[in-house]
């Protein structure tokens, strides 16, 4: 502890230069992968950015995104002042206004709408970043609106949903102790440096590695076995592996017999998924399926590393991942050291080995006291199982229909309309609202359709609480004051709460006081955290035993791990809601729509990570753009390109029955023949507008971004 304190002093003077090193974290990526930063500050300006060597997650390293932090902070595109729209929506015509005028205008409008239409008519949306989400949800519920929505309507939570349907509580891979790791459609070398280092260390100590991924990646290059599954067929692959494990009696009979529900029906169902059938459905050779199943089932302990969203970005996504997670229970690798070990979340879904009052902070009003959430009737399992938020993918449908009640206003924090399928349709729907506010760091295309735009500051200009899985915690301090007239998201939420007249003590107390309230059960205070600006290990981490289910059972209706979901049994006969992890091909595929596939023979797979981008957050930065100079570009297998007469960087048209875009061709062996991969979010070539708005998984509401049908042709 003393060594960390010595290393992480808030202001370490660099002798003779006038430079002070101030500690922070990079918040460009997701909450569990935020690397430590050393910010070199001179005369109130950040002049250099380095990785913080004492940070236990990143240990001094930064990826290309974090290295470009200065360009992000000092971008010429930063919003400088609150703005009020003066021209038509989408015109980008605004005039500067004061903060008081902006906040008063919002509060008056929201309260008018609340009085006329009810609080549920106002929507509260969060994109990136995520640190303020508990505060925005508390604001929404204190206002009386159930309609707190986030970008998690397309990212990660459907994966958690599949785990909760199976076990009641997710278990993450114990990378330090596992002897066999099955990575399912994740590529941590592009997305999660800490996990990538753990894989390298595991390989050094002899850990076996199986990787399921349609693409060739740095992770697949390290694998003992690479299973190049056809996009959207993950469930069939998992069921075929289960077939081998059961047929060869490699499953854990004690766990299955004493701690599971529905195994007999599940076992009978997987009989149909022989390795040969698996090869037919997935394109993975039968012998590789058998080899992988034997390796995963026979080496103990073994763990599965899931991805945040690729497997659930299919119209059959949750059922696919249920089939994958069943392998954990089938082999008895749930909640054991070296397996998929259960560590409860401490803050923002991140396990921090401390107890907090986050749930009490965000759930201020019972759902029963509010109107049904957006999408509740259409996606009831999303509502029942996650019990967290509304399903944002239903937003445009309810705006247009006005059913079961009208939606009149929306405030977005970092909202990007291009995250929706049929993105143009979403923007057109938002423009039908009576009032739209967006808070952002930059003037985005979404902001151009807002009535009021508010400037947010970056993470290095404010404080933030962050927990890490290894029991590390940090409460950052501003390295520099907020630039221009920008403010923190939390400050904006507090100001709005006051002007809305909400009688909520914790929305009046101030950020640091609220963090103290949340952390109270841990015995850690903001004052203590400030002594360790680079972060600290929690002094009394929670001690977690293996197999906690032996005493507490499983948090499922049966109290057991469920091969056959009792939640889904309630929806018997509803397509896509089968209680067993039934495999069905994607809604648009050669199997489901053969006539459509004749005209649109390629699988369109979008959004898989590139190392220099995370969504669109670094598109405007010259350093990251220089690493992919030909973007927007579509990845095409060279064999397909040769057949179509397409050369590198030539213009190609990608079309679906919905729309078409023109991009450059990027020829690469990373993608399979018959598959086109396109990164998302480009204003000049928005691939998400090629998807129908209702191309969704019926269980989660997630879009099928990774397995639609398309045509590609040379322009």
Please describe what each predicted stretch is.
Residues 122-130, 281-284, 307-314, 347-348, ...:
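Conserved short loop/turn motifs at secondary-structure junctions
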Residues 451:
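Catalytic, metal-anchored helix/loop core of enzyme active sites in primary metabolism
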Residues 117-121, 251-256, 303, 335-342, ...:
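Flexible, glycine/charged-enriched surface loops at secondary-structure junctions
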Residues 134-200, 205-211, 235-239, 328-448, ...:
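Extended redox/cofactor-interaction regions of prokaryotic respiratory oxidoreductases
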Residues 1-248, 285, 642, 688-715:
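N-terminal export/assembly segments and adjacent metallocofactor-ligating motifs
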Residues 222-229, 460, 471-483:
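Short beta-alpha connecting loops at secondary-structure transitions
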Residues 84-96, 101, 243, 248-286, ...:
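N-terminal leader/propeptide and maturation segments of large enzyme subunits in energy/redox metabolism
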Residues 489-535, 540, 599, 620-635, ...:
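Long, contiguous, secondary-structure-rich segments that constitute the structural scaffold
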């Amino acid at each position: 502890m003393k060594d960390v304190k010595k290393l992480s002093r808030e202001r370490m003077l660099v002798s003779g230069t006038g430079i002070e090193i101030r500690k922070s974290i990079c918040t460009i990526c997701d909450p569990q992968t935020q690397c430590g930063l050393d910010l070199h500050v001179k005369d109130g300006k950040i002049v250099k950015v380095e990785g913080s060597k004492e940070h236990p997650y990143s240990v001094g390293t930064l990826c290309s995104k974090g290295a470009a932090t200065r360009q992000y902070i000092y971008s010429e595109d930063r919003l400088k002042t609150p703005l009020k729209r003066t021209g038509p929506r989408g015109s980008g015509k605004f005039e500067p206004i004061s903060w008081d005028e902006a906040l008063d205008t919002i509060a008056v409008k929201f309260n008018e709408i609340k009085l006329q239409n009810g609080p549920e008519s106002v929507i509260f949306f969060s994109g990136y970043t995520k640190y303020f989400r508990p505060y925005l949800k508390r604001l929404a519920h204190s206002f009386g609106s159930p309609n707190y929505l986030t970008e998690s309507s397309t990212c990660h939570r459907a994966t958690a949903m599949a785990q909760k349907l199976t076990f009641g509580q997710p278990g993450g891979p114990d990378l330090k102790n596992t002897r066999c790791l099955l990575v399912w459609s994740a590529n941590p070398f592009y997305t999660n440096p800490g996990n990538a280092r753990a894989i390298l260390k595991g390989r050094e100590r002899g850990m076996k590695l199986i990787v399921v991924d349609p693409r060739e990646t740095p992770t697949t290059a390290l694998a003992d076995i690479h299973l190049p599954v056809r996009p959207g067929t993950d469930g069939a692959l998992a069921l075929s592996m289960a077939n081998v494990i059961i047929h060869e009696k490699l499953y854990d009979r004690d766990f299955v017999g004493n701690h599971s529900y529905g195994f007999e029906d599940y076992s009978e169902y997987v009989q149909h998924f022989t390795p040969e059938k698996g090869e037919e459905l997935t394109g993975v050779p039968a012998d590789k399926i058998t080899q992988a199943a034997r390796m995963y089932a026979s080496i103990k302990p073994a763990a599965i590393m899931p991805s945040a969203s690729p497997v659930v970005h299919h119209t059959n996504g949750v059922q696919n991942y249920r089939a994958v997670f069943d392998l954990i229970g089938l082999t008895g690798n749930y909640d054991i050291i070296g397996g998929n070990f259960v560590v409860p979340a401490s803050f923002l879904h991140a396990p921090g080995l401390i107890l907090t009052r986050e749930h009490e902070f965000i759930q201020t009003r019972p759902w029963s006291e509010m109107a049904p959430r957006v999408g509740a009737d259409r996606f009831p399992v999303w509502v029942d199982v996650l019990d967290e938020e509304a399903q944002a993918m239903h937003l445009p449908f309810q705006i247009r229909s006005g059913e079961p009640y009208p939606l009149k206003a929306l405030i977005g924090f970092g909202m990007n309309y291009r995250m929706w399928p049929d993105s143009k349709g979403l923007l057109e729907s938002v423009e039908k609202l009576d009032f739209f506010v967006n808070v952002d760091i930059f003037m985005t295309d979404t902001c151009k359709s807002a009535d009021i735009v508010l400037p947010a500051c970056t993470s290095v200009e404010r404080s933030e609480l962050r927990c890490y899985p290894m029991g590390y915690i940090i409460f950052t301090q501003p390295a520099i004051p907020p630039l221009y007239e920008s403010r923190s998201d939390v400050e904006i939420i507090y100001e709005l709460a006051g002007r809305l007249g909400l009688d909520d003590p914790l929305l009046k107390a101030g950020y640091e006081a609220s963090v103290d309230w949340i952390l109270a059960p841990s015995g850690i205070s903001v004052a203590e955290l400030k002594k360790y600006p680079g972060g600290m290990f929690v002094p009394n981490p929670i001690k977690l035993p293996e197999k906690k289910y032996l005493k507490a059972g499983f948090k499922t209706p049966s109290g057991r791990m469920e091969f056959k979901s009792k939640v889904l049994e309630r929806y018997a006969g509803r397509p896509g809601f089968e209680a067993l992890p039934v495999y069905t091909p994607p809604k648009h595929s050669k199997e489901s729509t053969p006539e459509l596939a004749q005209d649109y023979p390629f699988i369109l797979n979008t959004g898989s990570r590139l190392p220099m981008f995370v969504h669109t957050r670094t598109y405007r930065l010259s350093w990251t753009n220089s690493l992919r100079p030909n973007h927007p570009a579509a990845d095409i297998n060279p064999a397909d390109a040769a057949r179509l007469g397409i050369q590198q960087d030539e213009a190609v048209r990608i079309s679906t029955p919905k729309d078409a875009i023109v991009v450059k061709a990027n020829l690469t062996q990373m993608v399979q023949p018959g598959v086109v991969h396109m990164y998302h979010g480009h204003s000049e070539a928005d691939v998400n507008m090629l998807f129908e708005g209702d191309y969704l998984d019926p269980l989660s509401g997630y879009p099928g971004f990774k397995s639609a049908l398309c045509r590609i042709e040379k322009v």
